[in-house]
């Protein structure tokens, strides 16, 4: 019995020591800084983001590599302090800023559309005497963005940064912006970008769905860019328009005398077949250089379709009229002659008119 009571008391002492150790550890742990509730809920975080430098745009990967400056501003009355002579604000940078942020409430805001880890990140923190806080974060990273090639090469795209609040729903922390935040986001947009012209900056709200039907505050900061279409004319559109002449020339090169065609259909078929292989090679080259053009309907795919249609129509004309003389057998050689003359003049108008119309639709 004595052994059992000793074992029982030892077990209780062991459990008590574990409890005291856990209690001591939790008592010394620092609680997480609470939300600044002096202004009520939600805590409004003024947000601005500018593209400071755009290194490259990869349309095939649908991404861009850029350096962005994210500015967050909010008020925390607990951080107010008596104004010192000659100092407008307290300034912290890099490691000092991170150490100061560890002791205060900071909104959990992240750039959600980055790809991989940032190659560079730094912080700058300013605290004003009235409790106003301004946090500036510079980040260099690759950003996922969407590209719509439907109006290529007259298209406009948007380089976007997705700013999201984590951990708190939009009823507790809300991202917002005013005109000065939009002006900050638009600053630096006059910088040059190879093959693109920079345009306006837009900010839009779009809440992000969370667990249990909660919504998290989210802003999209979008920089509009317009493609310089002259860069795509020489490698893509000049060959496409030139290849349209192949089936037209194959039909036009024949001549008719007294209702009879003078050039062998076999020679003209060789021209069309050669043009077909040329268009296939051009199609393969364009899709290799611009894979995104083959994934959607756009001006380039329509012009390729027009090329294939013109080649097929030319081959049908050569076989039906030049090789087998089907119209002559059915309606006579003079009807066939007039039909051929009509095709010689109508086909170029239809083909080239359609090609120009496709370009005008993309430009509209």
Regions found by a protein language model. Give the residues of each.
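Tryptophan (W) side chains
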Residues: 12-14
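N-terminal secretory signal peptides that target proteins for export/translocation
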Residues: 1-10
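Channel- or pocket-lining gating/hinge segments that regulate access to a cavity or pore
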Residues: 219-347
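Flexible extramembrane loops and terminal tails that flank transmembrane helices
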Residues: 208-211, 230, 357
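Juxtamembrane boundary at the C-terminal end of a transmembrane helix
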Residues: 357-364
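Soluble non-transmembrane domains of integral membrane proteins
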Residues: 30-222
């Amino acid at each position: 019995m004595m052994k059992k009571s000793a074992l029982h008391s030892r077990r209780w002492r062991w459990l008590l020591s574990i409890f005291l150790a856990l209690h001591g550890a939790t008592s010394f742990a620092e609680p997480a800084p609470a939300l600044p509730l002096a202004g009520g809920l939600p805590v409004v975080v003024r947000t601005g983001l500018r593209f400071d430098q755009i290194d490259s745009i990869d349309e095939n990967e649908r991404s861009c590599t850029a350096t962005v400056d994210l500015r967050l501003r909010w008020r925390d009355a607990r951080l107010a302090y008596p104004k010192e002579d000659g100092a407008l604000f307290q300034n912290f940078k890099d490691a000092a800023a991170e150490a100061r942020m560890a002791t205060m409430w900071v909104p959990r805001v992240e750039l959600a559309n980055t790809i991989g880890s940032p190659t560079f990140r730094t912080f700058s923190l300013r605290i004003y005497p009235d409790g106003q806080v301004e946090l500036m974060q510079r980040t260099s990273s690759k950003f996922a963005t969407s590209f719509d090639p439907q109006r290529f090469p007259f298209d406009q795209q948007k380089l976007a940064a997705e700013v999201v609040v984590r951990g708190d729903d939009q009823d507790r922390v809300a991202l917002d912006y005013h005109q000065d935040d939009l002006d900050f986001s638009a600053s630096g947009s006059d910088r040059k970008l190879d093959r693109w012209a920079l345009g306006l900056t837009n900010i839009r709200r779009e809440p992000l769905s969370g667990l249990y039907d909660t919504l998290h505050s989210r802003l999209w900061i979008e920089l509009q860019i317009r493609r310089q279409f002259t860069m795509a004319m020489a490698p893509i559109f000049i060959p496409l328009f030139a290849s349209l002449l192949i089936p037209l020339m194959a039909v036009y090169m024949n001549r008719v005398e007294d209702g009879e065609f003078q050039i062998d259909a076999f020679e003209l078929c060789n021209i069309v077949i050669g043009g077909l292989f040329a268009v296939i090679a051009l199609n393969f080259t364009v899709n290799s250089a611009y894979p995104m053009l083959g994934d959607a309907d756009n001006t380039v795919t329509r012009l390729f379709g027009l090329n294939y249609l013109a080649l097929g129509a030319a081959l049908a004309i050569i076989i039906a009229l030049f090789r087998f003389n089907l119209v002559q057998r059915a309606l006579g050689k003079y009807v066939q002659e007039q039909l051929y003359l009509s095709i010689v003049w109508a086909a170029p108008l239809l083909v080239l008119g359609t090609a120009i119309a496709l370009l005008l639709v993309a430009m509209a």
